Amino acid sequence: MMYSPICLTQDEFHPFIEALLPHVRAIAYTWFNLQARKRKYFKKHEKRMSKDEERAVKDELLSEKPEIKQKWASRLLAKLRKDIRQEYREDFVLTVTGKKHPCCVLSNPDQKGKIRRIDCLRQADKVWRLDLVMVILFKGIPLESTDGERLMKSPHCTNPALCVQPHHITVSVKELDLFLAYYVQEQDSGQSGSPSHNDPAKNPPGYLEDSFVKSGVFNVSELVRVSRTPITQGTGVNFPIGEIPSQPYYHDMNSGVNLQRSLSSPPSSKRPKTISIDENMEPSPTGDFYPSPNSPAAGSRTWHERDQDMSSPTTMKKPEKPLFSSTSPQDSSPRLSTFPQHHHPGIPGVAHSVISTRTPPPPSPLPFPTQAILPPAPSSYFSHPTIRYPPHLNPQDTLKNYVPSYDPSSPQTSQPNSSGQVVGKVPGHFTPVLAPSPHPSAVRPVTLTMTDTKPITTSTEAYTASGTSQASRYVGLNPRDPSFLHQQQLRICDWTMNQNGRHLYPSTSEDTLGITWQSPGTWASLVPFQVSNRTPILPANVQNYGLNIIGEPFLQAETSN
């Protein structure tokens, strides 16, 4: 696929633009520029264009050089790319090009949380809604800038407020539109000498001739032709319309909706972002695509060689399911596994930290983020209502991979967000752990409250909130697989315990408290025990107890199966 260098400059040469450019309809350039010309004429002369002048402008725009149209479309696609969230750009390309089942594509919201409006011709005083632009560009439907209220989202759309998927955007058709469609159809059949025109019963009444006046300058055949023709027509790159799959323009909302989807189609759930989106930041071109044999960006070379790259065995796919699941359906789990210290949406007044690791991905010769994740398989994660852990955690890893070492010589201040602050976008391998403890002079209480009626391998999830220190850490507990028990010793006299209203302390100077959990990097079943004989301090029938750890509890660790 070769494009004229006049059309695509170095800034506009991008896989996103090259993939979508052949699917932009030719009417888009003519329609947007015609509306701008009419608006400019009205502001200058304070009167509307005559039909002859408007028709002359239309003919001029239709006969414009293909390179000019292509350059305008490429600039508009570059602007749309910035307004689409980065994690949805690949899906947008694959769905528009017909290589993937249509799924929701979310855009960056405006300051009010609504869908954005952009100027399509570098005119600050004339803006169009993103969904309107998508319908005009990729469906060729001539809509006015005030037709936003006529747009409706498909029943398959899960986020109607911000979705800009062209296949999910439909135009509501009213009774007047249906009546006009019938009238125009009868007019065309009469002009073409159809036999039905000779039937008086099927001829439109005479009063309809004076009831409608065509205000536009496009006739029906011309409008349909330019709405189906790609904008790259005439540049040596012709794409048959039949090869571009799309949903029908008209959809009867009163008819039954078939919600069944193909079994081979991937789910439409996407991983949300945990960091605020910088709207002015321009991401790297390599941060948008993950090449696959069916993807437009299949290879590290130029876009023209993607046909040769189709046979490459390397497959890069985006994860179709988040690594972690959240209790709230609205608050999906983030990619990064270290949470900031805030209140959990499902449990008021409670925050928690998660320790997780990911194995580094294999090296790839492609200049794209190497975060290949297989499609969803039967889950072997640990069962937890709040936290899910990857199944590839290595049980042979020692605790030093999960618990940071503490250096008293390095001063640290206790800040609210220092314990679990997300550190930017990490596309590849990362090993987030709990942040080091604050300065030794600062008190670091860890409140653990649980209900335990079984041995140390099981416990029931419970939470408590501490309103004293901002450096407090809260840990959620839940039953775990009893395999791979790990024990952690605590410093002498670094703990106190509240058992049914009674405060317990170390009995002797050799009394050292230990805690037990299972699987590296997971918090579960924290039960105090005596290190000397490894017996639980509390009997099995104790209902409630709290454990306060003050200072730096993590000193040494030993593993026992």
From Swiss-Prot:
Claim: Disulfide bond is one of the keywords in the record: no
GO molecular function: DNA binding; DNA-binding transcription factor activity, RNA polymerase II-specific; RNA polymerase II cis-regulatory region sequence-specific DNA binding
Modified residues (Phosphoserine): 264, 292, 295, 312, 328, 333
Region annotation (Disordered) ranges: 189-208, 252-445
Subcellular location(s) of the protein: Nucleus
Function (record text): Transcriptional activator of GFAP, essential for proper brain development. Recognizes and binds the palindromic sequence 5'-TTGGCNNNNNGCCAA-3' present in viral and cellular promoters and in the origin of replication of adenovirus type 2. These proteins are individually capable of activating transcription and replication.
Domain notes: The 9aaTAD motif is a transactivation domain present in a large number of yeast and animal transcription factors.
Assembly, per entry: Binds DNA as a homodimer.
Protein name per UniProt: Nuclear factor 1 B-type
Species assigned in the record: Mesocricetus auratus (Golden hamster)
